[in-house]
Amino acid sequence: MKTLRQRYPFSAIVGQEELKQALLLNLIYPGIGGVLIRGEKGTAKSTAVRALEAILPEIDVVDGCPCGCDPHGDALCPWCLEQEALESVSRQVRVVDLPVGSTEDRVVGSLDMETALREGRRRFEPGILADANRGILYVDEINLLDDHLVDVLLDAAAMGVNTVEREGVSWSHPSRFVLVGTMNPEEAASRQVRSVRGGQGHGGTGSAASGDDAPCGL
């Protein structure tokens, strides 16, 4: 029996007005580039991000598409381009988690080289970036993420495209998402997340937000 996950209501979060405003602004205009939230444990960082799931709207996606492509848009993955007709279905915008220990293949996806060599066709195994397309990509403790994976995320977020290349075979798909990262300043003392490409930063202490304590955004 499938059980529904209970989320703390976004509207019930007390304080942290700057944090909530930063998240909502990114939902309204994803072109902002995401938000990096820094705060001690117990300051509702993860709670606020996960609470967004209940207030996100529904969008139209191509039925069966591994990347959630927009049936009304021009940016389509190779799978959609091969279809004779695109059927659309509605689903809610997703909040997709990226675990800190993820491998590169898990993040960007992988190509089945055996199928490519044997049958002469590309077979793509979607990764986290495909799941997060047109949604929110959430990285808890982003300061602990491998530097190479940080570069992968920032490149995909900036370009809006994820490209997987293996042995001369490539697959590109739309990768448009709001990148939300959280970090604990105590754990970040020895390893800071680099400041690159626009976005917002927010520092939270207790129930009050401190703009002076905000780190550089992603």
Indicate where each model-derived feature is located:
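Conserved ASCE/P-loop NTPase catalytic core
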Residues: 1-209, 216
